[in-house]
UniProtKB/Swiss-Prot annotation:
Keywords: Cytoplasm, DNA-binding, Transcription, Transcription regulation. Residues 1-21 are annotated as: Disordered. SUPFAM superfamilies: YebC-like. This is Probable transcriptional regulatory protein RBE_0568. InterPro entries: Integrase-like_N (IPR017856), TACO1_YebC-like_2nd/3rd_dom (IPR048300), TACO1_YebC_N (IPR049083), Transcrip_reg_TACO1-like (IPR002876), Transcrip_reg_TACO1-like_dom3 (IPR026564), YebC-like (IPR029072).
Length: 253
C-alpha cells in the first residue's frame, strides 16, 4: 500500500509510547469492555472483541487484566458505557489527522481534541473531512528479523492477503477489516505475537516533514492528543525525513 509511514516514524514514537504504558493499557481495557458490552464475552462470535484481544496481546496486556476486563464488562452492575467518535482535522502544513476516541462524555472529549488542535496551530474539521486520504484496514507488524520478506509474503498469501511492505526494521501486513482476525491468528501461529496489530487508518500518500520546527510541533500535537484518556489512536499522513528523524532521535537521548 502506497504511503505508509516508514519505520523511523514508528521508532521515534515508540519511546514515547513505552513511557505511557499504563495509559495504553487503560485504553486497551476500555476497548475490551466496550466490545463485550456491544456483543458477548465469546470472541468466536464477537469480531470486535476478537480484534480488541488481538491488539491487547500485541501490546503485552497481561492475561489477568484481560480476563478481569471481560468479567467486569459482563457484570450487570457495570455501568461503564462508551461511545465511539472519530475526529478529523489538519495539523499545520496540511497534515491530515484522524483521532479515534471512546468516551463517556462527548462534550469533554470534543473540547479536549479541539483544544489540542488549536494549541499547535491545527484545525479540527467535520467528520469525513480527511478520511478519504486514508484506507481503513487491518495492520499487523513483525520485526524484520522474524523472517525474510519472501517467507512473510508467502505466509500472508496463505492467510488471505498479499499486501505487505518490508522496510529497514519491520514487515507490515495489511488486511481487509473483515479478514483481520483470521490473518492475525494465522500469522501468530507461524511467527508468534505481532509487535503491533490493530485496525486503523493508513495514509494513501504521505507528506515528508523535512523541517525540525514543523516536525516538533506536529509530534507535540500528536502527543497531546494521545494524552487524553478518551483518545484510543491517532493517525496522520506524514513521514519524517531521514535527516529530521536523526536530529529528533539525538534530541531524545
Amino acid at each position: 500500500m502506497a504511503g505508509h509511514s516508514k519505520f523511523k516514524n514508528i521508532q521515534h514514537r515508540k519511546g514515547a509510547q513505552d513511557k505511557k504504558r499504563a495509559k495504553v493499557f487503560t485504553k486497551l481495557i476500555r476497548e475490551i469492555v466496550t466490545a463485550v458490552k456491544a456483543g458477548s464475552t465469546n470472541p468466536d462470535n464477537n469480531p470486535r472483541l476478537r480484534t480488541a484481544l488481538a491488539t491487547a496481546r500485541s501490546q503485552n496486556l497481561p492475561k489477568e487484566r484481560i480476563d478481569k476486563a471481560i468479567n467486569s464488562a459482563n457484570d450487570s452492575a457495570n455501568n461503564e458505557n462508551y461511545t465511539e467518535i472519530r475526529y478529523e482535522g489538519y495539523a499545520p502544513g496540511g497534515i491530515a489527522i484522524i483521532v479515534e476516541a471512546l468516551t463517556d462524555n462527548k462534550n469533554r472529549t470534543a473540547a479536549e481534541v479541539r483544544s489540542s488542535f488549536t494549541k499547535y496551530g491545527g484545525n479540527l474539521g467535520e467528520t469525513g473531512s480527511v478520511n478519504f486520504l486514508f484506507k481503513h484496514c487491518g495492520v499487523i507488524q513483525y520485526p524484520l528479523e522474524i523472517s525474510s520478506a519472501e517467507n512473510i509474503l508467502e505466509t500472508a498469501i496463505e492467510a488471505g492477503t498479499d499486501d505487505i511492505v518490508s522496510d529497514e526494521v519491520l514487515h507490515t501486513i495489511y488486511t481487509d477489516i473483515e479478514n483481520f482476525s483470521k490473518v492475525l491468528e494465522f500469522l501468530t501461529d507461524k511467527y508468534g505475537t505481532a509487535e503491533e496489530a490493530y485496525i486503523g487508518w493508513v495514509p494513501l500518500n504521505t507528506i515528508i516533514i523535512d523541517d525540525k520546527e514543523k516536525a516538533e510541533k506536529l509530534l507535540k500535537l500528536v502527543d497531546l492528543l494521545e494524552e487524553s484518556d478518551d483518545v484510543q489512536r491517532v493517525f496522520g499522513n506524514y513521514e519524517l525525513s531521514d535527516e529530521i528523524y536523526e536530529i529528533l532521535q539525538g534530541s531524545d537521548e
